[in-house]
């Protein structure tokens, strides 16, 4: 997979283009708060969240819309892992 193309759509939503298609990602203030990410880091949050998801499933299996609150609710380790990745990237 090549690096995803991340395009801000406004209102905390991003269009992510992958080799196997595209998906929209919604970054929520709660996930930002829980990861200690600044609002200016939203695109980086999207990139790292997608990397995390793609370690667990193929790009072809990603839904057309991803809400990071839903990922956090479905995967108890998501927010902690994302916070660690953000800290390592700084």
PLM feature segments, named:
Residues 42-87:
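Acidic, low-complexity intrinsically disordered segments
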Residues 35-43:
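Ordered, soluble secondary-structure elements with a strong preference for glycine-centered loop motifs
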Residues 2-35, 72-89:
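N-terminal intrinsically disordered, cationic/polar leader segments
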């Amino acid at each position: 997979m090549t690096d995803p193309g991340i395009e801000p759509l406004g209102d905390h939503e991003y269009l992510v283009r992958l080799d196997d298609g595209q998906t929209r990602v919604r970054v929520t203030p709660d996930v930002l708060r829980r990861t200690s990410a600044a609002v200016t880091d939203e695109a980086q949050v999207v990139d790292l969240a997608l990397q995390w998801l793609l370690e667990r499933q193929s790009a072809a299996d990603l839904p057309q819309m991803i809400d990071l609150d839903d990922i956090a609710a479905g995967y108890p380790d998501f927010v902690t892992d994302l916070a660690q990745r953000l800290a390592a990237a700084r």
